[in-house]
Amino acid sequence: MLQSCYNFLKEQHCQKASTQKGAEAAVKPLLVPHHVVATVQEIQLQAAVGELLLLEWLAMAVMLLLLCCCLTD
């Protein structure tokens, strides 16, 4: 069950990343100063890393809950 939850969340993250890449490609033709583009990309990277860390934390929390449930049975 844990693996399927993790896989679902990972798939959602990948779909979100794909959507962001599409949006980024649509914005590229606009003339934007390089430092603004770099800042936006850095923020997107930080958000993606944060989301992955959250997924790992959630997976660990689910594992601990399952472990506690197994020990009490």
UniProtKB/Swiss-Prot annotation:
Reported function: May induce apoptosis in cardiomyocytes when overexpressed ex-vivo.
Pfam families per UniProt: bCoV_Orf14
TM region positions: 47-67
Record annotation: effect of changing residue 49 to L: In strain: Gamma
Annotated compartments: Membrane
Keyword annotations of the record: Membrane, Transmembrane, Transmembrane helix
Primary location: membrane
Outcome following mutation: residue 50 to N: In strain: Alpha/B.1.1.7, Gamma/P.1, Omicron/BA.1, Omicron/BA.2, Omicron/BA.2.12.2, Omicron/BA.4, Omicron BA.5
Name of this protein: Putative ORF9c protein
Keyword Transmembrane: yes
Organism: Severe acute respiratory syndrome coronavirus 2
Membrane topology: Single-pass membrane protein
